């Protein structure tokens, strides 16, 4: 009897605990839903341009992603103004400059820097900048000769064309008719990478440089940094010299073959946009006999490196024995007589009555700082004369062997003077006022 009573009491206890009252818990009641998980951070993990979507490409391009920058290169002849990108990304959608993109379908212009944004389901976004560089990023110049003829002479032009893909920073130039020949002296004879000169029929703007007919392609073979000429040109632009050449680096193809990186520059010549001396002015260069062209007209002076050869670069067509020739020969020799004469410091009778002193100072400072080996007495020492005016020094030119880039002269050393021992400057330094 006691056992039955115990069982009944135990069952009653269980019923009381189970629940009909307000204080119990129903074990079958639904559990609350967990908090939603945040979407993965938006990110582009791969960006490619596939030949299957871009017929103009010769090979697939897989871009490099570095934080928020996406970079890559494409061949120089590829068109990038309508490319289809393929993405691998974390997120729900991608846009370019606010325009939604269909992965592997939408075409966009990648000529300039492009801003891409990827967004996830939570509305978070991440921005990237895409830099698809054509070739090296420099403008590309295409030179083509008639019948793909080789450029073998620096005296005789051959017919051809030039075209420019200016890339991101320069204007394109459609195929244009030119003439082309070699240029230079030792740079033409000794080096496998040849320098060139091209000539348009009409004045033409070239790589952002003010229009003119003739343009030089400096190979810079002796200067493996390719920095010396351009660095010194910048020094010239900072000086008070009236004119200093401009230049632009470019990749050059000749008859479809890559020729290398060139420094494309203005030519040192008479022009309203270059050496502005007019039709009656003279552009002169200290030079060497063996460097002369057959049609060059020149004269000697008595004192410059005994004697000094002065090549008359302008005006064109000047002839020996003409009044124009006699004038400039006599004027430069009269200057030398005044410079080396007894009263050379006299304002009225000395060198100051012949030369524009500030230009002579600036020319010297630039050439001495850079230890330009040619500038002491060898070549590329330019100066100009307009009848009735004083002799102006410049433009500066030819610095591929400056800044110690020689092993045969003391100009290779940082210490000491070099250009100061130019005969004219050596005498000028004897005047404390100079």
Place the predicted regions along the sequence by residue:
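Beta-rich interaction/scaffold domains
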Residues: 24-138
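C-terminal motif of bacterial Sec signal peptides marking the signal peptidase cleavage site
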Residues: 15-16
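Phosphate/dinucleotide-binding and metal-coordinating scaffold of catalytic cores
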Residues: 35, 125, 131-434
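Sec-dependent signal peptide recognition
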Residues: 2-9
């Amino acid at each position: 009897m006691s056992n039955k009573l115990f069982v009944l009491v135990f069952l009653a206890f269980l019923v009381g605990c189970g629940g009909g009252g307000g204080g119990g818990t129903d074990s079958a009641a639904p559990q609350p839903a967990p908090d939603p998980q945040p979407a993965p951070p938006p990110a582009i993990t791969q960006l490619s341009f596939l030949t299957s979507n871009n017929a103009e490409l010769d090979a697939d391009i897989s871009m490099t992603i570095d934080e928020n920058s996406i970079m890559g290169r494409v061949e120089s002849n590829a068109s990038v103004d309508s490319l289809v990108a393929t993405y691998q990304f974390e997120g729900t959608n991608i846009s370019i400059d606010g325009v939604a993109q269909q992965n592997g379908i939408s075409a966009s212009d990648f000529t300039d820097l492009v801003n891409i944004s990827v967004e996830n389901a939570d509305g978070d976004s991440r921005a990237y900048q895409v830099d698809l560089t054509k070739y090296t990023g420099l403008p590309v110049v295409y030179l083509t000769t008639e019948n793909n003829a080789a450029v073998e002479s620096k005296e005789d032009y051959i017919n051809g064309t030039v075209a420019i893909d200016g890339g991101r920073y320069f204007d394109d130039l459609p195929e244009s008719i030119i003439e082309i020949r070699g240029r230079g002296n030792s740079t033409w004879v000794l080096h496998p990478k040849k320098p060139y000169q091209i000539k348009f029929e009409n004045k033409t703007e070239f790589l952002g440089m003010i229009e003119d007919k003739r343009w030089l392609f400096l190979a810079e073979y002796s200067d493996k940094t390719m920095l010396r000429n351009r660095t010194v040109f910048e020094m010239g632009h900072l000086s008070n010299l009236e004119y200093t050449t401009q230049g632009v680096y470019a990749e050059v193809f000749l008859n479809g073959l890559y020729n290398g990186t060139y420094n494309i520059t203005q030519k040192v010549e008479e022009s309203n946009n270059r050496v502005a001396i007019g039709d009656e002015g003279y552009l002169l260069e200290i030079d060497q006999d063996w460097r002369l062209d057959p049609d060059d007209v020149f004269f000697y002076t008595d004192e410059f490196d005994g004697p000094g050869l002065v090549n008359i670069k302008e005006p064109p067509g000047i002839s020996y024995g003409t009044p124009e020739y006699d004038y400039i020969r006599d004027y430069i020799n009269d200057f030398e007589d005044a410079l080396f004469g007894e009263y050379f410091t006299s304002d009225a009778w000395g060198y100051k009555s012949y030369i524009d002193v500030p230009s002579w100072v600036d020319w010297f400072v630039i050439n001495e700082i850079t230890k330009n080996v040619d500038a002491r007495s060898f070549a590329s020492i330019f100066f100009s004369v307009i009848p009735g005016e004083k002799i102006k020094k410049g433009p500066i030119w030819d610095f591929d062997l400056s800044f110690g880039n020689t092993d045969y002269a003391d100009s290779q050393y940082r210490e000491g003077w070099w250009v100061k021992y130019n005969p004219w400057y050596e005498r000028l330094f004897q005047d404390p006022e100079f």
